[in-house]
Amino acid sequence: NYYISAIAGANNGSSLVVMSKGTQYLQQSYKVSESFPFKWINKKWREGFYVTAMATAGSRWAIVMSRGSGFSDQTVELDFLYPSEGIHKRWDAGYRITATAATWDQAAFILSKPRRKPPDETQETLRTSAFPSTHVKEKWAKNLYIASVCYGRTVS
């Protein structure tokens, strides 16, 4: 079976869906909506699904939720700016950012707890006005790798 492994969207409403074979997923469900679909996500959590991909196209949100994701718990941080305090609180509780997406006025971060705790995982976030190529290369040298990228407005 093929399952959605990544999605992306553009300001003009265009989208890209990547489907992969051989993933660990057992079942998927997706939703496209004009506002962030909190109620739908909560309903799917109760059914054993977890957010595994997320994107925006213009002002619309696309969320993919899967069974068999390897997560034991998940939470959402949704904010008009960057929800620094919420993210740090979740990091301290063992959650890691597993998906990000933003519209012009909102940014969403999915933080998940893996079923099997990784030995020692560290995360950092960076907000920039241009892609941080040099910064990324410096972090690669310290064994930090890109987990998620999203495009949104930056606030100075």
Which role fits each region the language model picked out?
Residues 1-156:
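Terminus-proximal functional modules
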